[in-house]
UniProtKB/Swiss-Prot annotation:
UniProt region (Disordered), positions on chain: 423-446
Catalysed reactions, as listed in the record: [protein]-peptidylproline (omega=180) = [protein]-peptidylproline (omega=0)
PROSITE patterns, per the entry: FKBP_PPIASE
Protein name: Trigger factor
Encoding gene (name): tig
GO MF annotations, alphabetized: peptidyl-prolyl cis-trans isomerase activity; protein folding chaperone; ribosome binding
UniProt xrefs under HAMAP family: Trigger_factor_Tig
Alphabetical GO biological process terms: 'de novo' cotranslational protein folding; cell division; chaperone-mediated protein folding; protein transport; protein unfolding
Protein origin, superkingdom: Bacteria
Species this protein is from: Moorella thermoacetica (strain ATCC 39073 / JCM 9320)
Protein's job: Involved in protein export. Acts as a chaperone by maintaining the newly synthesized protein in an open conformation. Functions as a peptidyl-prolyl cis-trans isomerase.
Coiled-coil intervals, chain numbering: none
UniProt comment concerning the protein's domains: Consists of 3 domains; the N-terminus binds the ribosome, the middle domain has PPIase activity, while the C-terminus has intrinsic chaperone activity on its own.
Alphabetized Pfam families for the sequence: FKBP_C, Trigger_C, Trigger_N
InterPro entries: PPIase_dom_sf, PPIase_FKBP_dom, Trig_fac, Trigger_fac_C, Trigger_fac_C_sf, Trigger_fac_ribosome-bd_bac, Trigger_fac_ribosome-bd_sf, Trigger_fact/SurA_dom_sf
C-alpha cells in the first residue's frame, strides 16, 4: 500500500492512498459473495448466481462500492498510522479508481490535531501558600461539630431566635395571585440558614408557636426563575413549632461521642491534622492549576472548531443530566431563564475553548518530554480502582477495554506532575488566600 499526505489549510490534510491489486481483488470477491446472497435472481437459488449474472442484474458499480467499503476503512487507518496523524473528525472520502485487477485509489480529506507552538513550560514561577492551622480554625471546627451533634429542645413559651428550627405552614402570592411552588406545610426551616429568599427568615425571628405572620420579600433581579425576578411576594406564615439546639459541652465525653478520640486534647490534635492535610491538598491543587494555566497561556495553537463544538455539546449534556437530577428538563430550564440553546452555546464557548487548548498543550508537552504511563503505573491505577469499586482487578481491566482512556489520564497527570516538579515556587502576594477554615473542612473526624 502507498500513501501520500498533503497539508491543507486550517489543520486539514489530504491523504491519497493506493491499495495493492491483490488485496482489492480479494475484497471484490468478498463483495460479490455478500451481494449475491441479498439479491433474488430469477432462475437461481439465492446466493448461487454466478458473478457475471449478478453483474448483468445489478451492474458492476454496487460490487465495486461494496469492495471499497471493505478496503478503505482499514487502509485509511493504516495510512493515518504510517504518517502519525491524529484525526479529530470523520474523513471525507473520494474513490478515485476501483476495478478488477487494478489497485484501488482513494483520497481522504480530514481535520487533524493542530501543531502546538509551546512557550516556556519549565521554571514557571508559581505562588505556593503556606499551610497554617490556627487555634481559631480548630475552635470553629469544634463549633460546627457541636452544631451537628446538638440535641433539639422543644420551645413552647419563648419567641424564635436566630439558629432555631421553626416548623411552618406558608402560602405565597405574587401580584395578589397564588404562585406554583410557593406553598408548603410542616416545613422545617433553620432561621439564619439562608434557605429561603433574603429577608424571609429574618421576619420570623421573634415569632411564637401558633403565631401567624405576614412576610414581605422581593425576589432578586437575577433570580433563576425569570417570571419571579424582581417581583414582590407576600407570604402568610404560621409557626407550628420551634426547636432550639442544645450544644453539648466541649469535654472528653464529647470527644468520645463524636470521634474515636479519648480526650478533647486528642480530638483537637486530630482536627489539626485533618485541617492541615486538607489545606495541603488545596494548596497542591492550586499550584497544579496555576502552573497549567501559565504553560497554556505561553503556548500558541489554532483551535479546531470541531473540538470546541464537541466540548460545548458535552457541557450542555452535563447540564441536562444535572437538571434531570432536579426533576427539570432542559426545555423548562431554558424557558425559566429566558435563554435559547444558542445562548447556552455562546455562554459555554469560552470554557470549551480553554479546555481544548489545555488538552492540546498538555499533549504537546507530554510528546516533547516523552511522558508515557508505565505498565506499573497502569497496574497500580487498576488496583486503586478495584479497591474503590470493590471488584477484582481483572474485572476492572476487562471493563476498561483497551485501556486507552486510562493511559491518557495517567499521561496527563504525569505531565502536570512534571510541570509542578520543574516550576519555581514563590511566596504568595497575600498570605492566607488558600488557607482553610473549619467552614470548608470535613465535618467529621475519625
Amino acid at each position: 500500500m502507498k500513501a501520500a499526505v498533503e497539508k491543507l489549510d486550517k489543520n486539514q490534510v489530504l491523504l491519497e492512498v493506493e491499495v495493492e491489486a491483490p488485496r482489492v481483488q480479494k475484497a471484490i470477491d468478498q463483495a460479490y459473495r455478500r451481494l449475491v446472497k441479498q439479491v433474488n435472481i430469477p432462475g437461481f437459488r439465492k446466493g448461487k448466481a454466478p458473478r457475471f449474472i449478478l453483474e448483468q442484474y445489478i451492474g458492476k458499480e454496487p460490487i465495486y462500492n461494496e469492495a471499497a467499503e471493505i478496503v478503505i476503512p482499514p487502509a485509511y487507518e493504516e495510512a493515518v498510522a504510517e504518517h502519525q496523524l491524529e484525526p479529530i473528525d470523520r474523513p471525507e472520502v473520494e474513490i478515485v479508481k476501483v476495478e478488477d485487477g487494478e489497485p484501488l485509489v482513494f483520497k481522504a480529506r480530514v481535520e487533524v490535531k493542530p501543531e502546538v507552538q509551546l512557550g516556556p513550560y519549565t521554571g514557571l514561577e508559581v505562588e505556593r501558600q503556606e499551610v497554617e492551622v490556627t487555634e481559631a480554625d480548630i475552635d470553629a471546627y469544634l463549633k460546627r461539630l457541636q452544631e451537628r451533634y446538638a440535641e433539639l429542645e422543644v420551645i413552647e413559651d419563648e419567641p424564635a431566635a436566630a439558629g432555631d428550627i421553626v416548623t411552618i405552614d406558608f402560602k405565597g402570592t405574587v401580584d395578589g395571585q397564588p404562585y406554583p411552588g410557593m406553598e408548603g406545610n410542616n416545613y422545617p426551616l433553620e432561621l439564619g440558614s439562608g434557605t429561603f429568599i433574603t429577608g424571609f427568615e429574618e421576619q420570623l425571628v421573634g415569632a411564637r408557636v401558633n403565631e401567624e405572620r405576614t412576610v414581605n420579600v422581593t425576589f432578586p433581579s437575577d433570580y433563576h426563575e425569570k417570571d419571579l425576578a424582581g417581583k414582590e411576594a407576600v407570604f402568610q406564615v404560621t409557626v407550628r413549632g420551634i426547636k432550639r439546639k442544645k450544644l453539648a459541652p466541649l469535654d472528653d465525653e464529647f470527644a468520645k461521642d463524636v470521634s474515636e478520640c479519648e480526650t478533647l486534647a486528642d480530638l483537637r490534635q486530630d482536627i489539626r491534622r485533618r485541617l492541615e492535610e486538607s489545606q495541603k491538598q488545596r494548596v497542591e491543587a492550586a499550584v497544579r492549576q496555576a502552573v497549567v494555566e501559565k504553560a497554556v497561556a505561553a503556548a500558541t495553537v489554532e483551535l479546531p472548531e470541531v473540538m470546541v463544538e464537541r466540548r460545548i455539546d458535552a457541557r450542555i449534556r452535563e447540564l441536562e443530566r444535572n437538571l434531570q437530577a432536579q426533576k427539570m428538563t432542559l426545555e423548562e430550564f431554558l424557558k425559566n431563564t429566558d435563554k435559547t440553546i444558542g445562548d447556552l452555546e455562546k455562554e459555554f464557548r469560552p470554557g470549551a475553548e480553554r479546555d481544548v487548548k489545555t488538552e492540546l498543550v498538555l499533549e504537546a508537552i507530554a510528546k516533547a518530554e516523552n511522558i508515557q504511563p508505565s505498565q506499573e503505573e497502569i497496574d497500580a491505577e487498576i488496583e486503586r480502582m478495584a479497591r474503590i469499586f470493590r471488584q477484582d482487578p481483572d474485572t476492572v481491566r476487562k471493563n476498561l477495554g483497551d485501556l486507552s482512556v486510562l493511559k491518557y489520564d495517567i499521561m496527563i497527570k504525569k505531565t502536570i506532575d512534571f510541570l509542578v516538579e520543574h516550576s519555581k515556587p514563590v511566596p504568595p502576594r497575600e498570605q492566607g488566600a488558600a488557607g482553610e477554615t473549619a467552614e470548608t473542612a470535613e465535618a467529621t473526624p475519625a
